[in-house]
């Protein structure tokens, strides 16, 4: 497995953001975003893991970096839950590794774009039991959130920021909104923000993420 890209802050780290890229991208995809955020988050380390390369069914079996196989796109995503679980376990291991460096779990954040965001949702609100600084979900969905979703007390205390394009034709806006509503209805402090964009990231969105992180890091 490719080692994560680790961006150290200007000052000794006392917080961390673990940021997962989307389908077909790599660990360098969000490096410019992380570097921009570190200009104001002077004590925040960024960890950018790399998805394994695997065949992706919806792309004709072509091999590409992917956190899990996507078998069908509509009417709802059909995915490999087994591979999703493996990826979520990887994120859990990264959280534990950051804790061993001395960073408190309450100052560790999970962020993910598109497919990476789905892994982040699953890790934080299905698998992880304990405090976390928060979740940042960009242009994503939650394939394992259903009507039966039950959150523990610690999971309910994990704040979340959901950001989505109004014109996203890859992960429809309604799919992201559904994840937001699932969390909101279960008592999570969750914020929904829309932008006039497609399946992408805008400078204003990055600014808003920086402000959200700064407010929680003090």
Swiss-Prot record:
Its EC number is 3.1.1.1. Keywords: Hydrolase, Serine esterase. Pfam families: Abhydrolase_2. The active site is at 114 (charge relay system), 168 (charge relay system), 199 (charge relay system). It comes from the Bacteria. InterPro entries: AB_hydrolase_fold, LYPA1-2/EST-like, PLipase/COase/thioEstase. It catalyses: a carboxylic ester + H2O = an alcohol + a carboxylate + H(+). GO terms for molecular function: carboxylesterase activity. Transmembrane segments: none annotated. Belongs to the AB hydrolase superfamily. AB hydrolase 2 family. Homodimer. Hydrolyzes carboxylic ester bonds with relatively broad substrate specificity. This is Carboxylesterase 2.
């Amino acid at each position: 497995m490719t080692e994560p890209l680790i961006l150290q802050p200007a000052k000794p780290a006392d917080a961390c953001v673990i940021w997962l890229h989307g389908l077909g991208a790599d660990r360098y995809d969000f490096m410019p975003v992380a570097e921009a955020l570190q200009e104001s988050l002077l004590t925040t380390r960024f960890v950018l893991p790399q998805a394994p390369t695997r065949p992706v069914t919806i792309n004709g079996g072509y091999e590409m970096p992917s956190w899990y196989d996507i078998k069908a796109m509509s009417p709802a995503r059909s995915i490999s839950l087994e591979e999703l679980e493996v990826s979520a376990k990887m994120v859990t291991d990264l959280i534990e590794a950051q804790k061993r460096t001395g960073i408190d779990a309450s100052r560790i954040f999970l962020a993910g774009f598109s497919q990476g965001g789905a892994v982040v949702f699953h890790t934080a609100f299905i698998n992880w039991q304990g405090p976390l600084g928060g979740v940042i979900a960009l242009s994503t969905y939650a394939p394992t959130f259903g009507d039966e979703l039950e959150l523990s007390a610690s999971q309910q205390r994990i704040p979340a920021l959901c950001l989505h394009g109004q014109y996203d034709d890859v992960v429809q806006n309604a799919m992201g909104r559904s994840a937001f509503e699932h969390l909101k209805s279960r008592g999570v402090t969750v914020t929904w923000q829309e932008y006039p964009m497609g399946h992408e990231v805008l400078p204003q969105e990055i600014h808003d993420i920086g402000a959200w992180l700064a407010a929680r890091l003090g």
